[in-house]
Amino acid sequence: MATVAVGERAPGLALRGLDGQTYRLHEATGPVLAVFFKVSCETCRLAFPYFERLFQAYPQGGWHLWGISQDSSSDSQAFVEEHGVTFPILLDADWAISQAYDPEGVPTSFLIGPGAEVTRVVPAFQKAALNELSATIAGYVGAEPAVIIPDNDPAPPFRPG
């Protein structure tokens, strides 16, 4: 298998979240940013506060940010609490969805546009890519683009997963 690429149709996605709801890609209104992660991943720990900033930057309803955890419910809940994550965390403990998307590493983000087409794939942690994702989402929701990571932020410009 190979990582789902830009321009390809996103594999179906139906996972239960930590909140008990089931999230289905085909029922989502607007684009979905799906971020695959593991709680033990140091790069994920670096990235998730910025994903939270992205989530808070735009009104909800016109787009979705879903973290897809490859860990247990209890470990995922501890991660959420430690990092102050408020967006939905979906559980893929058996890795069925992860295998379908086949990210090369974690974190990997897939921006899935209307019609379920993958419009962007961002592996690892990349400052510039997060700001570009922000601008793309702003276009989808009709908002001014928010800078998620300013130039003077101390995070490294890139960190592999």
Map each language-model feature to its residues.
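Short, glycine-anchored, charge-dense loop/turn motifs used at functional sites
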Residues: G20, F110-T119, P123
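Cofactor-binding loop segments of dinucleotide-utilizing enzymes, especially the Rossmann-like FAD-
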Residues: K38, Q70, P114
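Non-globular targeting/processing and membrane-anchoring segments
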Residues: M1-V32, H64, E81-E82, D102-G105, ...
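Short active-site neighborhood of thiol/selenol oxidoreductases, capturing the structured segment around
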Residues: R24-R45, F51
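Structural microenvironment flanking redox-active thiols in thiol-disulfide oxidoreductases
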Residues: R45-H83
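Short beta->alpha linker loops
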Residues: D71, D92-A93, A128
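Short, internal strand/loop/helix patches
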Residues: V80-G115
